[in-house]
From Swiss-Prot:
Necessary cofactors: Zn(2+)
Protein name per its UniProtKB record: Small ribosomal subunit protein uS14
Gene from which the chain derives: rpsZ
HAMAP family: Ribosomal_uS14_2_B (MF_01364_B)
Binding of Zn(2+), residues: 24, 27, 40, 43
Organism encoding this protein: Citrifermentans bemidjiense (strain ATCC BAA-1014 / DSM 16622 / JCM 12645 / Bem)
Length: 61
């Protein structure tokens, strides 16, 4: 879980665009972020297993 200070720091605008980091809005995780779903891989997996992410289905072959 990300520290509260790091989440607040990421919300502030940076002087340089390159320094901005995408964060998961649910848990604040900065890594493994999926832009399409606007969340990290862990939250994406948790919510998709519950069926709360539209368009995501479990694959079977």
């Amino acid at each position: 879980m990300a520290k509260t200070s790091m989440i607040i720091k990421a919300q502030r605008g940076n002087k340089f665009k390159v320094r901005e980091r995408n964060r998961c809005p649910l848990c604040g995780r900065p890594r493994a972020y999926y832009r399409k779903f606007d969340m990290c891989r862990i939250c994406l997996r948790k919510l998709s297993n519950l069926g709360q992410v539209p368009g995501v289905i479990k694959s079977s072959w």
